[in-house]
């Protein structure tokens, strides 16, 4: 807005005065209660969630069909290959440095360098901030809304999941599930 005014001049003294005085901002922030009432409650939560682990196998010894998932987030890109039995065979996590497509291409090249004979990527899906870009640019089979992807993942571990908290690179989302 200031740039739209012609010939707006401010002396150095005036600029210093403006910078030294506190900026008054009038707004209200609605705050939530803490997620955990106590440290003990937090550790109980951690203990319960640590019981659910994704089984992991070595991609180099795997034979069969795999599924490729890509989460092109606003700050990081994640990729995974999952076997027919739900085991994690490959994972990739990297800051995308403002280039989710370039980072995803890097991940795909890494996958193909490691992909053994007898392994076939039969389905691919993207999600996240760059979901549509990645799906279109790399001609993936489908794209999925990030919150729906979170639900599928959470329901894999707990079919009765009723709350998902996503703390992402640029925002936070709380999903309450009612079925």
Tell me what each language-model feature is.
Residues 177-179:
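Conserved small/polar residues in nucleotide/adenosyl-binding loops
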Residues 101, 105-108, 125-134, 146-147, ...:
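Phosphate- and other anionic-substrate recognition elements at nucleic-acid/protein interfaces
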């Amino acid at each position: 807005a200031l740039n739209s005014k012609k010939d707006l001049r401010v002396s150095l003294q005036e600029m210093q005065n403006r910078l030294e005085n506190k900026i008054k901002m009038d707004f209200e922030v609605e705050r939530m209660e803490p997620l955990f009432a106590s440290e003990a409650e937090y550790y109980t939560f951690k203990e319960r969630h640590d019981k659910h682990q994704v089984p992991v196998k070595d991609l180099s010894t795997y034979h069969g069909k795999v599924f490729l998932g890509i989460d092109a987030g606003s700050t990081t890109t994640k990729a995974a290959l999952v076997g027919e039995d739900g085991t994690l065979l490959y994972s990739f996590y990297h800051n995308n440095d403002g280039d989710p497509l370039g980072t995803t291409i890097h991940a795909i090249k890494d996958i193909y360098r490691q992909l053994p004979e007898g392994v076939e990527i039969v389905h691919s899906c993207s999600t996240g901030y760059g979901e549509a870009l990645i799906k279109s640019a790399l001609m993936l089979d489908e794209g999925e809304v990030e919150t729906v992807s979170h639900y599928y993942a959470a329901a894999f571990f707990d079919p009765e999941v009723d709350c998902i908290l996503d703390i992402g690179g640029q925002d936070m989302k709380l999903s309450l599930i009612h079925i």
